[in-house]
């Protein structure tokens, strides 16, 4: 059972009693804080489609990435309190507005409050949009409720994960989590250019870290049938927050860096 009272929702397993006002790594309370619920057109085309993804951006995060592009939401507790009933109403409003899916963005640390809002089952796919740093036990509570998993796989390099996200165990945690996601939803199902089921793994190429990216792609190629899991290789790294003072992360990636990783992706036929 997912519970705030001895919180082990994420791999940090802080064990704090959030119902008593204690705060763990994510610094979140025992109720939802959400920053935004709106149609979102800037996800992968298979997710946003023509009509937008019904995205709910939850405050807080189980990671603390030095380069986070949503730091106000993820690290500065921006957002307003939302009940499970209000969250369900937001889902229904977004569906009425024509969304292609309901997109839960960084939801893990609020799951005890989110799960009631997912019942009864929604008439559109549910997307679980996360940083990849997930507990397998927590993910198992989502089986049958989530249709599409949209995790990051940020790091194959543990030292890099420690330096940039305070998570030296990220590679093994994300590996186990993504395997569980795939076990639940299986290979990609695409209907009318819209994803209805499956896993898309996102990877952001970081400056000066080509080997980290190649390691991520190697892991994907080694663990899934070709084209069963989709890969979204992202180039939009921008120095933000602490990264501005942390070379080489104080610069954008070069076209040559991105092309080197993209060529390897094609070589692996991902």
Place the predicted regions along the sequence by residue:
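Long, low-complexity, intrinsically disordered polar/charged segments
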Residues: 39, 50-53, 58, 64-77, ...
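Short, conserved acidic/polar surface loops in the N-terminal third of protein domains
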Residues: 66-70, 76-81, 114-117, 138-141
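Conserved alpha-helical substructure of the radical SAM core
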Residues: 72-101, 264
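Flexible, glycine- and charge-enriched loops at secondary-structure boundaries
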Residues: 80, 84, 167, 171, ...
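Conserved AdoMet/S-adenosylmethionine-binding subsite of the radical SAM
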Residues: 89-247
């Amino acid at each position: 059972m997912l519970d705030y009272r001895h919180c082990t929702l994420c791999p940090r397993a802080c064990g704090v009693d959030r119902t008593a006002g204690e705060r763990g790594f994510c610094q979140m309370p025992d109720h939802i804080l959400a920053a935004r619920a709106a149609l979102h057109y800037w996800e992968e085309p298979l997710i946003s489609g023509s009509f937008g993804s019904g995205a709910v951006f939850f405050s807080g995060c189980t990671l603390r990435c030095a380069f986070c592009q949503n730091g106000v939401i993820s690290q500065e507790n921006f957002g307003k309190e939302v009940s499970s009933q209000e969250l369900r109403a937001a889902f229904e409003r977004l569906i009425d507005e024509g969304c292609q899916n309901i997109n839960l963005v960084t939801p893990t640390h609020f799951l005890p409050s989110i799960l009631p809002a997912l019942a009864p089952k929604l008439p559109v796919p549910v997307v679980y949009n996360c940083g990849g740093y997930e507990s397998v036990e927590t993910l198992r509570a989502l089986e049958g409720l989530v249709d599409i998993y949209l995790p990051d796989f940020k790091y194959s390099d543990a030292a890099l994960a420690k330096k940039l996200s305070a998570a030296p165990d990220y590679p093994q945690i994300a590996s186990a989590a993504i395997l569980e996601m795939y076990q639940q939803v299986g290979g990609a199902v695409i209907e009318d250019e819209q994803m209805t089921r499956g896993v898309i793994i996102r990877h952001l190429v970081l400056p000066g870290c080509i080997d980290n990216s190649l390691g991520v792609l190697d892991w994907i190629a080694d663990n899934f049938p070709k084209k069963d899991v989709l890969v979204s290789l992202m180039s939009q790294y921008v120095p933000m927050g602490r990264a501005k003072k942390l070379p080489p992360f104080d610069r954008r990636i070069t076209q040559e860096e991105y092309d080197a990783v993209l060529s390897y992706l094609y070589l692996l036929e991902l």
